[in-house]
């Protein structure tokens, strides 16, 4: 199939600031497109110009960057708007068999739904209303715009919480979710682990890393003071976390490692007993399936919308966790075995094929 993927926002900005990156090849959506290519589909990926990398790249498929307009109102970090993208879809729609667009609350999904609804999938992640402007724009979109203008497109949710949310506003929704996939070529796995846990996160307030440090310190005091905690990531709270670690006299147990590329991250994840999450606010967290395919269980609260997948398949612990849960994972290898057993079902090519099968079943029923 000839597939157009509409995904203007390639990575998550912080405080409406889009960071400059050297490459987009390590993003979730780029690797998802690779999964479609591995299933012998011809891919074109449409991206907002603000997310264009600083260095020239050669891509595995066609990648087009579109200029954003009305940027003072439609922030490219939140909801990009592009006249050029609308024109491109209108002009080129006949050259594609399928259009896959990210999010119901987005202009690219609105464009595709208006111009070619019969060949449009909206791959939807949000499970709650966006908080901007006291949720008013989000509520207007989901209650008025989506039911009128996006009702003919077919929505495939990325999680069960996303399904339960979007089903309130649209009827043409798949009950079967398709989660974020992982490029298994970038992530190996192993059963044997070191005595260490890992955090992979931006060091920003909503990620609540300080809480993880304190819980890990309680684990050191109560169970095993030889364990290590590796914190991978960068952000505004780096210095504050560094001071906290010193106050706890835990410099020999807790390390702030900064940014790591996929190859480096793979080694650290693969060697760790568990990935730790205690976030205040998140949707689908890509770090969760990345950890699982490394054979590394996840300990998280219930906030991430893909946390249900961990609980259902016994891939870790999902609750308001504490040091006792760290001990449970550290001493129970069955969680690691479950992660290894389910690894293949989280691959990009597996999940892309799953999405196409859902689509084919849908159009055969029409």
Describe every region a protein language model picked out.
Residues 161, 181:
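Carbohydrate-associated surface elements
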Residues 280-281:
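Aromatic "clamp/platform" in nucleotide-sugar-dependent glycosyltransferases that forms part
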Residues 1-51:
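N-terminal subdomain of nucleotide-sugar transferases
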Residues 297-300:
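Short hydrophobic beta-strand element within catalytic cores of glycosyltransferases
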Residues 30-32, 138-156, 169:
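Membrane-proximal helix-turn-helix segments that form the acceptor-binding/catalytic region
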Residues 4, 156, 191-207, 211-216, ...:
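Conserved donor-binding/catalytic core segment of Leloir-type glycosyltransferases
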Residues 242-260:
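Nucleotide-activated donor-binding/catalytic signature segment of Leloir-type glycosyltransferases, i.e.
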């Amino acid at each position: 199939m000839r597939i157009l993927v509409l995904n203007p926002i390639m990575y998550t900005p912080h405080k409406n600031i889009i960071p400059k990156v050297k490459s987009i090849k390590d993003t979730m959506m780029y690797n998802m497109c690779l999964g479609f290519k591995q299933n012998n589909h011809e891919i074109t990926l449409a991206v907002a110009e603000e997310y264009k990398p600083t260095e020239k790249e050669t891509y595995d498929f066609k990648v087009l960057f579109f200029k954003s307009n009305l940027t003072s109102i439609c922030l490219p970090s939140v909801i990009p708007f592009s006249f050029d993208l609308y024109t491109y879809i209108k002009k080129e729609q006949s050259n594609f068999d399928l259009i896959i667009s990210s999010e119901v609350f987005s202009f690219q999904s609105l464009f595709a739904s208006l111009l070619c609804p019969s060949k449009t999938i909206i791959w939807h992640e949000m499970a709650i209303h966006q908080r901007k402007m006291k949720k008013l724009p989000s509520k207007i979109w989901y209650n008025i715009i989506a039911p009128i203008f996006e009702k003919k497109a077919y929505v495939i949710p990325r999680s069960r919480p996303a399904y339960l949310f979007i089903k309130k506003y649209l009827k043409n929704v798949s009950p079967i979710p398709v989660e974020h996939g992982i490029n298994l070529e970038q992530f190996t796995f192993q059963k044997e682990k070191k005595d260490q846990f890992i955090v992979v996160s931006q060091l920003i307030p909503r990620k609540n890393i300080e809480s993880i440090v304190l819980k890990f310190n309680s684990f050191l005091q109560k169970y095993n003071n030889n364990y290590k905690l590796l914190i991978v990531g960068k952000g505004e709270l780096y210095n504050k976390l560094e001071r906290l670690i010193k106050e706890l006299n835990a410099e020999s147990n807790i390390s702030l490692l900064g940014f790591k590329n996929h190859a480096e991250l793979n080694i650290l994840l693969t060697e760790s007993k568990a990935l730790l999450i205690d976030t205040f606010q998140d949707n689908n967290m890509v770090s969760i399936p990345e950890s699982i395919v490394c054979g590394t269980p996840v300990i998280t609260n219930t906030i991430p919308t893909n946390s249900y997948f961990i609980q259902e398949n016994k891939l870790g612990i999902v609750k308001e966790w504490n040091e006792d849960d760290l001990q449970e994972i550290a001493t129970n290898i069955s969680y690691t075995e479950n992660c290894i057993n389910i690894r293949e079902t989280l691959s990009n090519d597996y999940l892309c094929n799953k999405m196409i099968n859902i689509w084919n079943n849908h159009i055969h029923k029409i």
